[in-house]
Every structure is written in structure tokens, then in C-alpha cells.
From Swiss-Prot:
The entry's keywords: Mitochondrion, Transit peptide
Residue stretches of biased makeup (Polar residues): 101-112
Main location, first listed in the record: mitochondrion
Subcellular location: Mitochondrion
Name of protein: Required for respiratory growth protein 9, mitochondrial
Biased composition (Basic and acidic residues): 301-320
Claim: Coiled coil is one of the keywords in the record: no
Function: Required for respiratory activity and maintenance and expression of the mitochondrial genome.
Keyword flag Transit peptide: yes
Pfam families listed in its UniProt record: Neugrin (PF06413)
Amino acid sequence: MSISYVARIINGNSEVGILDQVREPTLKIFVRTIAQIHVPLRTTTPRATQYRALSTQPNRACTQQTSSILATTPRALHTSCARDRDWQAPKPFKRRGGGRSVQNNPLASSHASEPVANDPFRHLSQNDYARPTARPQAYRSKTGDSGGREQRYKPAGGARKPRRPNPESNTQGGNWAEPKTKEPWRIQKEALAKKFPEGWKPRKKLSPDALVGIRMLHQQFPDEYTTETLAQKFEVSPEAIRRILKAKWVADPETEVERQARWHNRGKQVWTKWAALGKKPPRKWRAEGIVRDPIWNEPRGPNHKDKAARAEAQRREAQRRLASGMMG
């Protein structure tokens, strides 16, 4: 009889009780059918027995690791040896309600005893198929149980290997060594510095009128206009003045006309650029039509009227000071 059936009878529900009386025979037949079903026991293979034996007993790697850890910890943290060994022996499993243990269970004993007789690996010891041992410890501790600061872990290999010296570094001076091959621009720069210690001064081109003027000045005043003086005046080297004075070449009339025309056009180009930058050209080139922009002609400083007014104000201020000094 079900619990619901008894509860309903107690509550006085007679109609529901009649329906439960009709269902009770059917429920009994169902329970009897389930009781006749036979569930075969699960057979274990030799490999499963092997794994079960390994799971109940600690391996060698676990034992070594535990012993190394216990050796390095302080004594205050150690527990008794008997308590530490208790975990190695498998204990029977007990239920909370105080039921039967695994040792008294017939099914568990049958599972553990049946495959032993048919085990093909029974001639081998447990250590033969045990798990591989752990890798050697990378760190080791000094003698002693205390974990003080002086007894820290140190590498098993000893001191570290020294680093390989860098061949490119200069160990004597501490600076980086210069490359063996220099860049082309560096080679050219060093060559120019060696050839021109005072800096690069390109040769200045002199007009035909300047060449004639140099010869005439040196011929008329040789003591006053020497080679060094002419070099400073015309901003060329003394060697260039010496070559100009030494030259005896005189151009014919046609070549002279071409030279004058070429230098005249060159003067126009040069002063056109200067006028664009705001520089006032000489009268010769202004007559040729080379003038600067009108915006550059606006007076930016004080003009003549401002100068006259400022001078008149200064004169009056001086008279006033003189009169006040005489009166006082």
C-alpha cells in the first residue's frame, strides 16, 4: 500500500480510497515483475584491476616529492609520522548513516577476487608497471630543516654560466667599435675637410671690367695695392690675383663685345633676384627697368617731417628747462 493511500483513508476520503483499492493489485504485479529481473555483475578486465591497484597505493614519485617537501619545511609545521603514514593505507569507506562498509560488501569482494585468478599480469610485481618516476628536482636545499634566509633553494647545477662576450663591443674604452667599412658620404666629408681646412670657398667669377681694374691699380700703385690687398678687396684668393696679373692675353674686339653682352645679361638676372627680395638696385640697373615692388618703397622709418617736428620739440624742451633753471 502506498503512503498516499493511507493518508487519504485517514482523512476520510472514501471515494479516493476505493480507486486506490482497484489500483493496488496492478502495482503489486509490477513490483513482482521487477523483482524477477536479474542484473549480471560487471566483470573487470586485468587493465582495470591494474589501475585500481595503482590508485590505492602511492607511487614512488609522490613519495619522493612528499619527503622532499617535509625535509624543507620548519619543524613547527611538522606533524607526527604516524599521522602522515595514515594516508598511504586505504581505509574502508563508511556511510554517514552507519551502514555497511566496503569490506563487508559481497559485491565489492567478488569484484576484487574474481580477476586475480585470471590475471595474465599476476607474475609481475607492482613496481614493474608502476608510473614513471618524477623528473629530478631542479632545486635542492642545504643541510638542515630550518628554512632560513641563508638556506634558500639554489640551482642544482651550481653557478650560472658566464655570458659570451660581444665581439662588436669595445671592452677597453666601453664604446661601440666603429664599422670596418665607411659610408661614401663619410669618406667624401673627410676628404673635403682635409683639402679645405678653412671651409669650402668656391672660386669667384670676376667681370672683364674687374680684371682690367685689378691690372690698372697694381700697375699704377704697386706699393699700395699689393696682391694680398687686392685679394681682400675683391674677395678672392691671392693665387687668383697672381694669375690675373701674370696673364698677357687680350681679347679681340668681337670677343670683347660678346663678353660685355654676356655679363650685361648676367647682371640683369642677378639684380632681378635681389629686387624681388627687397634690395634696391643701383641706378644703372634701375635705368634698365629693374626696380623692386612698390610695396618696398613705402617708408618704414621716420620721414623728414617727423624728424623736423621731433627736433622742434626737443628745442622747446631745452628752452623750458633753461628758463626754469634761471628762475629757480
